[in-house]
Amino acid sequence: MIEPTATEPEPSRGAEPPGPAATAAASGRAPRAALSLSLPLPGSRRATVVGAGSFGTALAVVLARGGLRTTLQARTAEQAAQLEAERENRRYLPGVELPAQLRVESVAAGVARADYVFLAVPSQRLDEAIARLGEGGLGRRTAIVSAAKGLVPPHGSAPSGVLGAAFGAHRVACLGGPAHAQEMVHAGAGLVAASRDQTLAETLANVFTRAGVVCERSDDPIGVELAGAAKNAAALAAGATEAQGLNAAGAAAGHIFAEVWRYAQSVGARPESMIGLAGAGDLVATALARESRNRRAGELLAAGVPAGEIPERIGQAVEALQSVPLLALTLERAGGQAAITGALGRLISGELPLQEWVALVRTTVPPPPRWRRRPSRRALTWATVRRLLGGGRGSAQAER
């Protein structure tokens, strides 16, 4: 379960002992100068992208075009050798030539010289990636950027929280927003770079801007990550329901977004993260994309294909198939409403027939809002007078 964000998570419990900057960051009182001691230096130009799937490859291409000395790390030496020889990822990103300045190697090579490490791996494999980072000579100034859009098992933790616990929250950022791989390398994307550290978020935004990719900055990594998890689940739900009508598909996606948002509020996420690029923007892009893995996975579920066979049918991992049951469990543990998200998890596991899923989507009514009684005009007038009087006294005391 994700912890509320009122305070910083504990500093590094990984390979490095927490230094002064990490300790100060955990207290919430660190000056920017102290934090910057553990961030990449100005002019840092080396990036490593871990994960050579469609998005990881596209990300590496964009970073290399933006002037960073970029290395793409494949999972196996055989895959790395094939990419290096063909200078194209024909399986996951066909038709996109790898820039000459982009190096390819296996994850066994480590990340000792990287200023930025981008983790383009599913949230279910994040623990494995963290272990490799610890073994790979991660530098003290290296920033770690997660591109996962799901929660980390077994407790449903946000990726940034898990990375922050291992390496220090001020060194961690995440990416969100609509960024389909093929389109990103040809026409750009709408990214969000989120971090607790303002300098890191600004630096990442500038890196992508130089590469021709629009990138917003955010100080709400948990909100951005939950928005991405909600998007994946909503896209899967819409795909599973679309054959029953667009209204049903819209209802399924809307219910899931609302359930995740109520939980996100309880852990301190900001509304802008859910309604902006990271949430609504990403959902619209995914819903419109016929090639979306999560949407296609939903369509295959509706066609009766078992969830275990879907990744092979699609040819890539589908993060939502594994993240939705964990997302539902996380919402339920927190005492939140998760009727539709939980039902989607049971549809994935085969416990809930499709027609029962559709019927539940069509008949579920979300909890009513808390109606607020409008104050009378007289009450408003007196409230205004009291506020003005109180404000005057407060201002006078502040000046003293």
Could you describe each region identified by the protein language model?
Residues I2-E3, T7, R13, G28-V96, ...:
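NAD(P)+-binding Rossmann beta1-loop-alpha1 motif at the extreme N-terminus of oxidoreductases
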Residues G53, T57, A77, V104-A108, ...:
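Electropositive phosphate-/nucleotide-binding environments in soluble metabolic enzymes
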Residues L98, V104, A109-G188, L204-A205:
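Rossmann-like NAD(P)(H) cofactor-binding subdomain of soluble oxidoreductases
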Residues R125, G136, V162-R171, G188-S273:
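Internal alpha-helical scaffold of NAD(P)-dependent oxidoreductase catalytic cores
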Residues S146, R171-G176, C215-D219, I275-G276, ...:
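General beta-strand structural signal in soluble alpha/beta enzymes
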Residues K231, A235-G239, Q265-G279, L283-R400:
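NAD(P)-dependent Rossmann-like dehydrogenase/reductase catalytic/cofactor-binding core
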